[in-house]
Amino acid sequence: MKAKITLAKEFKIGEIDKRIYGSFIEHLGRAVYGGIYEPDHPTADEDGFRGDVIDLVKKLNVPIVRYPGGNFVSGYNWEDGVGPVEKRPKRLDLAWGTTEPNYFGTNEFMKWCKKANTECMMAVNLGTRGADEARNLVEYTNHKSGSAWSDLRKKHGYDEPWDVKLWCLGNEMDGAWQMGAKTATEYGRVALEASKMMKWTDPTIETVLCGSSSVNSKTFGRWEIGRAHV
């Protein structure tokens, strides 16, 4: 076997963003319940987080974790997962055909990330919801005080904002399996407006768009081109 090596001094090797090596946690199977959160487990701490899982995540040195999904996020009402656990509603999860008890939500995830020494990446629902709900979540997590959503966070027992910097705008929105699936143009419009309003709420954040979910998709390639014209 012969190999050819081409050296070109004009090309520079860029620094790889460590976030590429991140992971995500979704309300799917035993990922959350029975995975990272299991109050009755022998290693569970005062928050119900499994200590053995946290130790393993620390060993992996995971730089960032996305939450709450995944397909799950496209039908998720983030408000269901904050406040007193006993008052949180149970919802049908159409993504995975289960019932979501909402024992574990936004604030629990933030606390888990701190214990696991990893950064939070939040995903917002752009399937069944939109820009207003997305910017409200940014206000809840990142605004210090003096507004309805930030004061609600404080009422829930979290005086300081979580200061989440990276936000994912939906999940696999080109897929027919996704709740609220969209064309590239439809997604581009809602993503643009959501990102704009989220950054008006907190100018320090970054937002991440959805690309094609699969090379086997009929819109692969055209999805990115169509979105670029928005």
Give the predicted meaning of each segment.
Residues A228-V230:
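Conserved small/polar residues in nucleotide/adenosyl-binding loops
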Residues M1-G226:
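Non-catalytic accessory regions flanking glycosidase/transglycosidase catalytic cores in CAZymes
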